[in-house]
């Protein structure tokens, strides 16, 4: 996915993280909040997220090359919400999550563009058991039609608000 972020000064992954974490979570659209709340509720009931707490270290943390780990703005293995950081550079970061439904890697990047910046994200999913394929098949239409577009417009909105407050 690619999100166009118009205007603004230099943009980094860590800067966007700060912007996102400093924003009221209720500013995300109702449909996205509802689907995320439903997922968390079902995760608690069916214990879908328990494996992440049982296994505190990331499976891929040890695979991060030493030079990349040294350049990372936070140590590999740093918890970040439901995810574990593999590495963070100024313009790219990679996170990992492991639970009862998936073992996934989230890649995010920011690049300059003619009108501002582009924010990219991609998720790579590896099945962890027989539930992964049907689970991903069930949620995929909701992710693609509601969650991702909702997050994209939300990110654009909070970015533009920040640019406007900064005067440019």
Give the positions of each predicted feature.
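Hydrophobic ligand-binding cavity/cleft-lining segments
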Residues: 1-72
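Intrinsic-disorder/low-complexity, polar/charged segments enriched in Ser/Thr/Lys/Arg/Asp/Glu/Gln
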Residues: 2, 92, 116-120
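Short, acidic Gly/Pro/Ser/Thr-rich loop/turn segments
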Residues: 10, 102, 128
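Hydrophobic-ligand binding "helix-grip"
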Residues: 70-113
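Short acidic, glycine/tyrosine-flanked loop/strand segments centered on an H-E-D-like triad
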Residues: 109-131
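A short acidic/glycine-rich loop-to-helix N-cap element
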Residues: 125-146
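Short, highly charged C-terminal tails/helix-capping segments
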Residues: 155-168
